[in-house]
């Protein structure tokens, strides 16, 4: 059995330390107040049994709480007082030096919490450690100085989650849609160097990757680009190649048809080269965040401005999917699934029906998804229904990174605008805690819910105020050179924070457990569903109320909870104990999702969750868990057709693994060993994570650096929907 120290390091449970701590308190009380040896042993053994029953590594603080409770149960109140006083004195000492232990533990790779915090960061790498060191300082400043103490305490208690506190000390925003079109067409500046409009497709791709890296180093969230913005440069290259061919074949008896054939062949090679640049640059670049850029590539045919551009865009999309299907080579030279870029493919009338013009691209996308987990799918049809601007027009556009969606916006010229906009940040409410705090009383639930929402509102205002007054100079690539704006040097970014240009997100998590506790049923049950929808509606109403009062675009957001699921679960267990079906797991359910272990088919799940996506305008994604579908692409195509007609944004989860020890490329299994969940090759028994390639959908993005115990349990509990 293991425990987690305050520094984050994971060590073996040692009952002798509990006994020694009790005896220290026992030694300074009078004889009449002392505990007997049998009582001390009983307390220590009870704590050990409690820790064993939790099926996870307990923290030192949780164990000390158990010791206090045990001393109280023995009616040794004077001993308890001494024990509590000692804890308090030690906590005061720690406050005088708030970050040293955590920083030292992560440098020495002893910090298990950090190791499993982000499934796309490797904390043993020096550059990642530097980011984590800066993050510890930022979190310390945030907790002690920058943030309202009530919000800090609520964050620590798991009542809410103040996202990305490790970046809050700086004036940084969350995620965005990069205006690549503006930067490529009008030029940009990177590291003080002016970059003019590119003269070929491959150069445009190279510049795009440099922009991606610069943007990623200037923010903490994901970013998205559209292949549509690269499509015009295909024809630029076509014309350039055509001129070269004419010069090469001047005076030769070569037909125009043959010349055009040669032009298109060379053009295809350039497209291959350009797309390869994006794929390999993205997975090999290291940003100042200590990781590859969290980048999403949007593939939307109807975004093209004319038929020629659409045809050229189709060529780029085909090559992007083809290369992703192939994968990238790991250190053993084996083709594996990369985490990035995340790919999103838009389903539309031109590509979703058999016989449609670009149906072949959708079939290729389905083949890729079955092997590599991407692309994910946006339905143009449903998005047109959900995202209606003030002109009454439906809009289709990419999320910012994983799932965060902008709300519809019309600029001063009356045109809808999405690229160049961003999200200010996220604060997530723990819906399960609201329900448990109410004790199941509906009236109390709504009162507590409103109080907690206002606390989240205060936390969101803190995020907004942290950005307010920020000069454009803090990130020229974003604010001055086109990614998000063309502001003057020294000009504050304030005008971009209001009027709907940017959004700010009220996240929510654990709707399933919340509804289950309040109604006794899953929210998929017809008797419980109205309550679930009313919870969603209340968050929408509050966001609209705040938006109207402040001219800031608040919107509900289905939080992915990558590692926070474990934090929330532990906090709930500490506050309310183990409640069957509610707090008996080391995770809580993401956003509005159906519980991972619930028996439901793919089509019913997607149809059910579509109602909740509509009520989550700030961000949402649904998934279905499927077996290996590489030999059943017809079923994948059926699912894609269903997605197009029924839900705005969805993905298919499968497995893509490889054992470097024995070459096994089937599913790497999750097993339990000494109370801890491990990944194990079923063929050779390898459990060395450094020699396993495991790709799983964590929460929208693909994770490849493994997960904490809570998220790992959630992955293990997932049932198939097909």
Stretches found by the model and what they are:
Residues 23, 457, 461, 512-516:
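Amphipathic, well-packed alpha-helical segments that form the structural scaffold of globular domains
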Residues 1-107, 716-721:
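Charged, amphipathic alpha-helical regulatory modules used
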Residues 685-722:
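Long insertion/accessory domains within large nucleic-acid-processing enzymes
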Residues 232, 504-517, 537, 697:
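Contiguous, well-ordered alpha-helical segments that form the cores/surfaces of helical PPI scaffolds
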Residues 271-275, 279, 516-517, 711-717:
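Metallocofactor- and cofactor-centric catalytic cores in central/energy metabolism, strongly enriched
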Residues 5-10, 29-36, 53, 410, ...:
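A ubiquitous short alpha-helical element
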Residues 89-500, 521, 525-687, 693:
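Conserved catalytic cores of very large enzyme subunits
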């Amino acid at each position: 059995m293991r425990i987690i120290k305050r520094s984050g390091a994971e060590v073996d449970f040692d009952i002798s330390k509990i006994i020694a701590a009790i005896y220290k308190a026992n030694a300074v009380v009078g004889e009449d107040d002392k505990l007997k040896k049998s009582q001390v042993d009983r307390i220590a053994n009870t704590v050990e049994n409690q820790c064993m029953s939790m099926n996870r590594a307990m923290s030192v603080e949780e164990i000390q709480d158990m010791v206090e409770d045990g001393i109280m149960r023995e009616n040794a109140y004077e001993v308890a007082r001494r024990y509590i006083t000692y804890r308090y004195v030690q906590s005061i000492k720690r406050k005088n030096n708030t970050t040293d232990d955590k920083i030292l533990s992560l440098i020495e790779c002893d910090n298990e919490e950090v190791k499993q915090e982000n499934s796309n960061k490797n904390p043993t790498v020096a550059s990642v450690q530097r980011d984590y060191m800066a993050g510890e300082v930022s979190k310390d400043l945030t907790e002690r100085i920058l943030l309202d103490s009530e919000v800090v305490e609520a964050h620590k208690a798991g009542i809410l989650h103040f996202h990305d506190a490790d970046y809050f000390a700086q004036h940084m925003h969350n995620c965005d849609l990069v205006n690549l079109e503006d930067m490529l067409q009008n030029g940009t500046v990177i590291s003080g160097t002016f970059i003019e409009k590119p003269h070929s497709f491959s150069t445009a791709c190279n510049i795009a990757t440099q922009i991606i890296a610069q943007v990623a180093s200037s923010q903490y969230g994901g970013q998205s680009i559209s292949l549509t913005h690269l499509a015009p440069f295909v024809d630029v290259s076509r014309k350039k190649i055509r001129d070269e061919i004419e010069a090469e074949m001047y005076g030769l008896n070569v037909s125009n048809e043959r010349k055009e054939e040669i032009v298109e062949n060379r053009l295809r090679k350039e497209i291959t080269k350009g797309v390869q640049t994006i794929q390999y640059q993205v997975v090999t670049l290291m940003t100042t965040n200590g990781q590859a850029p969290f980048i999403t590539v949007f593939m939307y045919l109807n975004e093209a401005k004319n038929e020629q551009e659409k045809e050229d865009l189709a060529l780029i999309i085909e090559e992007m999917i083809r290369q992703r299907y192939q994968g990238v080579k790991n250190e053993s030279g084996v083709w594996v699934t990369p985490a990035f870029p995340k790919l999103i493919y838009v389903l539309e009338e031109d590509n979703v029906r058999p016989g449609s013009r670009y149906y072949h691209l959708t079939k290729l996308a389905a083949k890729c998804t079955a092997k590599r987990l991407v692309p994910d799918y946006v339905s143009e049809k449903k998005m047109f229904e959900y995202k209606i601007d003030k002109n009454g027009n439906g809009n289709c556009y990419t999320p910012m990174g994983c799932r965060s969606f902008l709300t519809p916006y019309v600029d001063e010229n009356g045109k809808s605008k999405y690229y160049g906009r961003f999200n200010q940040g996220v604060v997530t409410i723990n819906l399960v805690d609201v329900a448990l705090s109410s004790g199941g009383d509906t009236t109390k639930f709504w009162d507590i819910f409103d109080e907690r929402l206002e606390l989240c509102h205060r936390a969101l205002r803190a995020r907004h105020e942290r950005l307010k007054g920020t000069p454009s100079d803090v990130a020229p690539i974003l604010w001055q050179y086109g990614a998000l704006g063309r502001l003057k040097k020294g000009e504050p970014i304030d005008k971009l924070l209001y009027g709907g240009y940017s959004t700010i997100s009220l996240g929510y998590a654990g709707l399933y457990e919340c509804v289950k506790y309040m109604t006794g049923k899953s929210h998929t049950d017809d008797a419980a569903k109205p309550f679930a929808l009313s919870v969603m509606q209340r968050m929408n109403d509050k966001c609209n109320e705040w938006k109207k009062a402040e001219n800031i675009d608040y919107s509900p957001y289905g939080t992915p909870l990558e590692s926070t699921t474990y934090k929330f679960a532990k906090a709930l267990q500490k506050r309310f104990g183990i409640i069957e079906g509610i707090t008996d797991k080391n995770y809580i359910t993401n956003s509005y999702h159906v519980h991972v272990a619930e028996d439901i088919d793919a089509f019913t799940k997607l149809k059910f969750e579509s109602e909740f996506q509509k009520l989550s305008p700030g961000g949402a994604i649904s998934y279905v868990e499927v077996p290996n579908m590489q030999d059943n692409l017809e079923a994948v195509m059926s699912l894609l057709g269903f997605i197009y007609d029924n839900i705005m944004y969805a993905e298919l989860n499968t497995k893509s693994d490889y054992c470097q020890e024995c070459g096994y490329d089937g599913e790497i299994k999750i097993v339990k060993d000494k109370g801890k969940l491990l990944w194990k090759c079923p063929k050779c028994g390898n459990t060395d994570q450094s020699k396993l390639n495991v790709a799983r959908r964590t929460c929208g993005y693909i994770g490849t650096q493994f997960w904490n115990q809570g998220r790992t349990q959630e992955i293990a509990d997932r049932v198939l929907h097909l």
